């Protein structure tokens, strides 16, 4: 089994940071971009904030 599969198999829900569970579609665009640490002018992105 690959190392990544081993890591995924041992992953616990507590291992996720709260920031990873934020619903970016439910917040203002500028706040979502701030959390993601990117802007639509500097990355190729398919997120709803970049495609609307």
Curated annotation (Swiss-Prot):
Cross-link (Thiazole-4-carboxylic acid (Thr-Cys)): 42-43, 46-47
Cross-link Pyridine-2,5-dicarboxylic acid (Ser-Ser) (with C-47): residue positions: 39-48
Source species, domain of life: Bacteria
Sequence positions bearing (Z)-2,3-didehydrobutyrine: 42, 51
Positions of post-translational O-methylthreonine modification: 46
InterPro entries registered for this protein in UniProt: Thiopep_bacteriocin_prcur
Propeptide: 1-38
Residues the record lists as 1-amino-2-propanone modifications: 52
Places the protein is found: Secreted
UniProt cross-link Thiazole-4-carboxylic acid (Cys-Cys), position: 49-50
Cross-link position per record: Thiazole-4-carboxylic acid (Ser-Cys): 39-40, 48-49
Keyword vocabulary terms for this entry: Antibiotic, Antimicrobial, Bacteriocin, Hydroxylation, Methylation, Secreted, Thioether bond
Keyword Secreted included in the entry's annotation: yes
Function of the molecule: Has bacteriocidal activity against Gram-positive bacteria, but not against Gram-negative bacteria. Inhibits bacterial protein biosynthesis by acting on the elongation factor Tu (EF-Tu).
Family, similarity comment: Belongs to the thiocillin family.
Protein name (Swiss-Prot/TrEMBL): Thiocillin
Organism, scientific name: Bacillus cereus (strain ATCC 14579 / DSM 31 / CCUG 7414 / JCM 2152 / NBRC 15305 / NCIMB 9373 / NCTC 2599 / NRRL B-3711)
Lineage summary: Bacteria, Bacillati, Bacillota, Bacilli, Bacillales
């Amino acid at each position: 089994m690959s190392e990544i599969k081993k890591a995924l198999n041992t992953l616990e829900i507590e291992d996720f940071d709260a920031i990873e569970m934020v619903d970016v579609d439910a917040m203002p665009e500028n706040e979502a971009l701030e959390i993601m640490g990117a802007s639509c002018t500097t990355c190729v992105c398919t997120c709803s904030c970049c495609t609307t």
